[in-house]
């Protein structure tokens, strides 16, 4: 479908399914009293008064999602990493082929905390001429500011005898990043966010107590805590410390420990809304189920734009119904197209790339064609 992208305002919405294989998703094997399987977010909401359970899950969350998200031990031949590389490479090539009348810019919105996009972009420096914009500015200390997204960069040559626009990939991390840290406190409140690409060596979190989120594992861990006062004390403030240390939206509905990030979150959402309201916009969705109610509402509202086209790549045949439910729709509007797997298979990252950059992929006619 690559031919559908030229000349358009291109936006991506990438969720946890893209990093699966290295970073776990928020699904779990936990069953509640009604015999319902819950996601991690649903467990934390339903068991909001169980402090031990909350701390056990947040400790697991730190070790399995946040700590792994730095990708310190990632090898360059890792398949997930190579898929991120291929995505960025193909997008850079697409922008290089755009005509001079079209801005050479693509926006990637992601709810993932990990550093896959950053590391993939870094690996392409020197191979391609492009600018990867993660919203930061600075040299020794890199700080975030929304105004950093509104840039155009040109190559002029030694004698300034021509202007050639450099392709820009904008990365919007809607739920924060493991690399973001609060700085410059005033009256015990931070007012800036900086980027640190490495985990603090003096981490204070104890070893993980469970291997997976399941009733059996959590019950065993809770019993261990009950019989060990020292361990109980060590784990007591896990959730509180994580909220303080990481600039993230954690897997609980409507949870903002810090108003600075709440403001930053809504600024990012407004940017998503603004991009989808532009003429001839495209939104390509992969690995995302629309469980975030704010994002779901923005995308639904954006469907009123008659020139917007949304392509949702569904991991499995069941994913289509899950997304319909999360969007609170009975059927998709005309400008949402779902791309389903063939032969009861799955659309993983590799197949997504093949379908996305395949010429003449059969999809229903676009709204504005």
Feature map (PLM): residue ranges:
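Active-site-proximal helix-loop elements at catalytic-domain edges
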Residues: 69-76, 239-257
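Short, charged/polar micro-motifs that form catalytic or ligand-binding hotspots
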Residues: 77, 103-111, 164, 259-262, ...
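A Trp-anchored, charged/polar loop motif used as the substrate-binding/catalytic surface
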Residues: 1, 86-94, 148-158, 260-271
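Gly/serine-rich nucleotide phosphate-binding loop at the start of the catalytic core
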Residues: 1-135, 181
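Extended, H/D-rich, highly charged conserved domains that either
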Residues: 21, 100-250
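SIR2/sirtuin-family catalytic core signature
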Residues: 1-12, 18-20, 96-97, 217-236, ...
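Compositionally biased, low-complexity linear motifs
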Residues: 29-38, 125-133, 192-195, 279-282, ...
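Alpha-helix boundary/N-cap detector
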Residues: 48, 52, 75-82, 108, ...
């Amino acid at each position: 479908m690559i031919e559908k992208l030229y000349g358009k305002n291109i936006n991506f919405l990438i969720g946890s399914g893209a990093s699966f294989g290295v970073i776990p998703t928020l699904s779990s094997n936990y069953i509640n009293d009604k015999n319902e399987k819950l996601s991690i977010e649903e467990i934390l909401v339903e068991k909001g008064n169980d402090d031990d359970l909350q701390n056990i899950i947040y400790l697991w969350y730190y070790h399995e999602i946040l700590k792994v998200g730095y990708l310190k031990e990632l090898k360059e031949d890792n398949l997930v990493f190579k898929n991120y590389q291929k995505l960025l490479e193909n997008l850079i090539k697409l922008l290089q082929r755009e005509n001079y009348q079209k801005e050479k810019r693509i926006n990637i919105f992601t709810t993932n905390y990990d550093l896959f996009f950053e590391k993939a972009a870094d690996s392409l420096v020197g191979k391609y001429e492009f600018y990867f914009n993660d919203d930061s500015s600075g040299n020794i200390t890199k700080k975030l500011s929304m105004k950093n997204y509104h840039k155009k960069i040109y190559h002029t040559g030694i004698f300034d005898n021509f202007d050639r626009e450099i392709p820009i990939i904008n990365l919007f991390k809607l739920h924060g990043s493991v690399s973001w840290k609060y700085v410059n406190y005033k009256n015990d409140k931070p007012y800036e966010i900086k980027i640190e690409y490495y985990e603090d060596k003096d981490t204070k979190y104890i070893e993980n107590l469970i291997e997976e989120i399941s009733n059996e594992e959590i019950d065993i861990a809770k019993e261990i805590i009950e019989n060990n006062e020292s361990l109980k004390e060590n784990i007591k403030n896990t959730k509180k410390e994580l909220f303080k240390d990481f600039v993230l939206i954690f897997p609980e509905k409507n949870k903002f420990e810090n108003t600075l990030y709440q403001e930053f979150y809504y600024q990012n959402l407004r940017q998503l809304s603004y991009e989808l309201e532009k003429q001839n916009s495209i939104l390509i969705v992969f690995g995302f189920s629309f469980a975030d109610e704010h994002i779901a509402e923005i995308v639904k509202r954006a469907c009123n734009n008659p020139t917007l086209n949304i392509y949702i790549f569904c991991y499995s045949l069941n994913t289509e119904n899950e997304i319909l439910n999360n969007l609170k729709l009975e059927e998709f509007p005309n400008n949402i197209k779902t791309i389903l797997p063939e032969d009861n298979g799955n659309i993983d990252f590799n197949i997504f790339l093949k379908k996305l950059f395949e010429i003449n992929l059969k999809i229903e006619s676009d709204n504005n064609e």
